[in-house]
């Protein structure tokens, strides 16, 4: 699949994760909503589903892994920053085929697109400190 299709999958996945965080609807409902309400013709739908289901199934573990690198409790994070961090943490931990620099850069770009003015700096700082936990060999 083309990198642009993966980028679009990440973008849609962050929005879905954000929606879940605020609504607490089931991930299957969120998936269905996003797949029916968005043009997915140029989206890697399988990757979108993997990201949403992966974060949904492992968010507690991902949060625990991220917490040592945060400057405040996880429940005090901006919801979009949390969604971006969870997605990036999942990619870093589970998708070793994705180079860590790509996962971090994509997260920074998502934070720039959806977050507050300085969100991308915060996301970059957290992931830069956390990368060795998720990718000890920095592949």
Swiss-Prot record:
Report the superkingdom from the record: Bacteria
Keywords from the named record? RNA-binding, Transcription, Transcription antitermination, Transcription regulation
GO terms under biological process: DNA-templated transcription termination; transcription antitermination
What Gene Ontology cellular-component terms does the record carry?
Answer: cytosol
A GO molecular function annotation here is: RNA binding
The record's comment on protein family reads: Belongs to the NusB family.
NCBIfam families assigned to the protein according to its UniProt record, in alphabetical order: nusB
What this protein is reported to do is described as:
Involved in transcription antitermination. Required for transcription of ribosomal RNA (rRNA) genes. Binds specifically to the boxA antiterminator sequence of the ribosomal RNA (rrn) operons.
Protein name in the entry: Transcription antitermination protein NusB
Organism equals Idiomarina loihiensis (strain ATCC BAA-735 / DSM 15497 / L2-TR)
User: Gene name on record?
Assistant: nusB
């Amino acid at each position: 699949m083309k990198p642009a299709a993966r980028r679009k999958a990440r973008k849609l996945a962050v929005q879905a994760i954000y929606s879940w965080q605020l609504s607490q609807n089931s991930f299957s409902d969120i998936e269905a909503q996003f797949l029916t309400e968005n043009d997915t013709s140029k989206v890697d739908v399988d990757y979108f589903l993997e990201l949403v289901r992966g974060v949904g199934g492992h968010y507690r573990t991902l949060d625990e892994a991220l917490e040592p690198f945060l400057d405040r409790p996880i429940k005090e994070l901006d919801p979009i920053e949390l969604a971006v961090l969870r997605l990036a943490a999942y990619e870093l931990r589970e998708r070793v085929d994705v180079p860590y620099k790509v996962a971090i850069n994509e997260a920074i770009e998502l934070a720039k697109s959806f977050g507050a003015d300085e969100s991308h700096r915060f996301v970059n700082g957290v992931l830069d400190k956390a990368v060795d936990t998720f990718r000890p060999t920095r592949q």
